[in-house]
Every structure is written in structure tokens, then in C-alpha cells.
Regions:
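Generic protein-terminus/edge-of-domain signal
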Residues: 1-59, 105
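Conserved metal-binding segment of the jelly-roll/cupin
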Residues: 60-73
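Ligand-binding loop in jelly-roll beta-barrel domains
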Residues: 70-93
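Single conserved hydrophobic/aromatic residue that forms the stacking wall/gate
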Residues: 152-162
Length: 162
């Protein structure tokens, strides 16, 4: 039996989170089951991904994204070329929004705000790629707007398992 890997997430040097192009962009790629304490967003802009989250399959195409909650076991299969932006953020960013008996969990079902979130992620990545003067401020502005939208429209309060 294969052991499920724990992935340690480190933010970009110039941002309070990690943003990058998915390493399986050339296709023919499998990322085995793993987990981390961070919250992760996979936003597909071209191509498709087969995403497995808690043993449930999600087929992601252009314009789709999925949010992986902290400690959720997931794996990814990218059979063909794709353009997917990945955001990884520390759970600490949401610390003041949960208490000892209530945690934040993000829904996996499609939401009305999906298009707006995809536009924000796209703009964040384009600004980051250009790295013009003040890029970090613009990215952080978009990032915090995205967090707000996610918190208000996509989060579901949950209780810890006793």
C-alpha cells in the first residue's frame, strides 16, 4: 500500500501565498495522492484535468476551478496539455474566521461567482508574469478580494470531528 504524501507549502518570496503554473502543464502527468495544511485552488484556463478529491472524481475543463481544503487527500491526472494556475494559501489567513468549535470549509460544487473568481485569478497571474512596478500591491489587492468573495460565497462553516 502506498503511503499518502504530505506536501509542505512555502509561499513565493514576494507574496504571502504561492502562485504558479501547474507542473503537469505538458500532459502525461500524474500527481499521486497527497495532502497539506494549506488551502489550494486549481484554476484551469486551457485543456482539462482529472482531479480526485477524497476519492471523488472531478473533471475540470476550461473555466473551471476547484478548491482543496486543508488536510483533504487529493490527486491529479493531466493526460493532455493544459494551462492551470495554482494558488496555495496558508490556513492562517483564515484564522480569525474560525473558533475552537467551528472551522471553514470551502464547497466543491459550482457557484455563481465562479466566473468572477476565474477572472481574478487570471488577472493575478498576468500581473505576476509582467512584474511591472507595484505588481505585488495589485496582486495582493486582487488576492484579498478573491479571499473575501470565497469566504462570503463559497465557505461552509463546519464543526470539527470529535
Amino acid at each position: 500500500m502506498k503511503q499518502i504524501q504530505h506536501e509542505l507549502i512555502m509561499p513565493n518570496e514576494d507574496l504571502p501565498f504561492k502562485m504558479f503554473i501547474f507542473e503537469g502543464r505538458e500532459g502525461n502527468y500524474i500527481r499521486e495522492k497527497h495532502w497539506h495544511r494549506s488551502i489550494e485552488i486549481f484554476a484551469v484556463f486551457q485543456g482539462t484535468l482529472e482531479f480526485y478529491l477524497n476519492d471523488q472524481e472531478y473533471l475540470l475543463g476550461c473555466g473551471d476551478f476547484i478548491i482543496v481544503n486543508s488536510n483533504e487527500v487529493h490527486s491529479i491526472h493531466a493526460p493532455k496539455e493544459n494551462m492551470t494556475v495554482v494558488l496555495q494559501m496558508s490556513l492562517d489567513m483564515f484564522e480569525k474566521y474560525y473558533t475552537g468549535d467551528q472551522f471553514i470549509c470551502f464547497a466543491h460544487a459550482p457557484q455563481a461567482q465562479d466566473e468572477q473568481l476565474m477572472e481574478m485569478i487570471c488577472e493575478m497571474y498576468m500581473v505576476y508574469s509582467d512584474k511591472k512596478c507595484g505588481y505585488d500591491l495589485k496582486i495582493q489587492s486582487l488576492f484579498y478580494d478573491m479571499l473575501y468573495l470565497s469566504l462570503i460565497h463559497i465557505s461552509e462553516p463546519t464543526r470539527p470531528i470529535s
